[in-house]
């Protein structure tokens, strides 16, 4: 009986490592293959940024196409900061709300985000126009593609009574907030695949299938 349990355990371990290997292969090669184009100039400039694990898009707050403050009200944000650009990211709700710093990361939060479909949230921050750096890239976009990007981003917010649903008191600072989001987070639908899909919607060069930041930023 003990031998059977050991054999079963070994099969489970073997299956896990096979799955992990396939997952890494898919994410690696999916991130290497490019789709979309980069423009030398355009109607608007946006930014794509990463903290090494998570990615966001940074969009001009007010243009002829949209005034983001009519969708994401400035009310819950401190009026001491700048509202020139709006930074938006999608991700695991538990991870977002319970991990303001990496030092506070819990194993249970990480495992839930990785292996179980979980609730999601939008992270929003207003700021001045970002500066280009190794972890932040400027991208030009034309008006029609920007409209598609806007539709994608707006559709990611979960609405309540036809308005986005603020998660009160959970921002990391006075200049950022969290909102309820649509869709579930899991291994094949990560914060980076959201950014990747946003860029693909706007026909911006990125990886075909990017689960990690490198599969996005390496193309920009």
Q: Each predicted region: which residue ranges?
A:
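Internal catalytic-core helix/loop-beta-alpha segment
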Residues: 136-156, 161
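Alpha-helical transmembrane signal-anchor/signal-peptide segments
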Residues: 28-51
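Second-shell loop/turn segments in exported
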Residues: 132-142, 179-186
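N-terminal short leaders/motifs
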Residues: 1-12, 34-39, 63-80
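Glycine-rich catalytic cores of cysteine/serine-nucleophile enzymes that process amide/ester linkages
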Residues: 46-140
């Amino acid at each position: 009986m003990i031998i059977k349990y050991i054999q079963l355990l070994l099969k489970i371990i073997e299956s896990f490592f096979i799955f992990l290997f396939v997952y890494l292969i898919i994410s690696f090669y999916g991130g290497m293959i490019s789709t979309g184009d980069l423009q030398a100039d355009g109607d608007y400039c946006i930014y794509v940024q990463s903290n090494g694990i998570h990615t966001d898009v940074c969009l001009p707050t007010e243009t002829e196409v949209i005034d983001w403050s009519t969708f994401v009200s400035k009310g819950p944000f401190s009026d001491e900061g700048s509202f020139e650009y709006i930074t938006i990211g999608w991700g695991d709700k538990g991870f977002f709300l319970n991990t303001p710093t990496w030092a506070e990361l819990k194993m249970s939060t990480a495992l839930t985000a990785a292996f179980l479909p979980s609730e999601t949230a939008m992270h929003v921050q207003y700021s001045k126009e970002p500066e280009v750096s190794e972890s932040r890239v400027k991208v030009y976009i034309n008006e029609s593609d920007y409209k598609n990007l806007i539709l994608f981003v707006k559709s990611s917010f979960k609405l309540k009574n036809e308005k986005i649903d603020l998660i009160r008191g959970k921002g990391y600072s006075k200049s950022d907030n969290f909102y309820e989001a649509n869709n579930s987070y899991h291994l094949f639908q990560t914060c980076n695949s959201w950014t990747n899909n946003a860029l693909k919607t706007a026909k911006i060069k990125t990886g075909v299938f990017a689960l990690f930041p490198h599969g996005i930023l390496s193309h920009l």
